[in-house]
Amino acid sequence: MQGYLEQIKPSVGDAWRTDELYVKVGGNMKYLYALMYDETRFWIAQQVADTKYTANINPLFKEGKELTGKRPNTLISDGARNFNEGFKKEFFTVSNPRTRHIKHIRLQVDHNNNKMERFNGEVRDREKVMRGLKTVYTPILKGYQIYHNYMRSHEALNNKTPAEACGIKVEGENKWVSLIQNASAKNLGF
């Protein structure tokens, strides 16, 4: 199903957020890096790494560019060194328009990371119920990304899913079944 969904380009805007959160994998602490479109909360890409500040997150940003077909005009992060290095490698350009990296988050102004922190709490709540993940290669995180984007409606989006807010409509009473059927039909060439 993931391959099917990767062929659908979400209509995302120019402001993206990124952050990391720790997750327990096989009894060890790992870090889940996530990239999200600010306005609709569409979870664009993810990456699991062993370390927090030194992990190479270029693949996360590269996947985001490939999925959306663009780079953001603004990237909001907590300013960790690896976010800045990934930004320079994947998003920075000398030609205009240049992508701006907002890396100093403040609580009282527009440049906070509250949406991303709320998202982190959502993922952490799910992981806590599961008592951690068994392996880095688990399909649970990709499945949760699908659930977050295509199934879970958000009150702040007028009870739409992030995918619906990005122009992707999943028809049917049971969206899981619809996505599975669509992915199967695509793979069979119907």
Segments predicted by a language model, with ranges:
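Mobile genetic element proteins and their domesticated derivatives, centered on retroelements
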Residues: D19, L35, R41, L75-D78, ...
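Acidic/histidine-rich, metal-coordinating catalytic segments
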Residues: R71-F83
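C-terminal domain-tail junction helix/linker
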Residues: V129-F190
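A short acidic (Asp/Glu
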Residues: N28, F83-K89
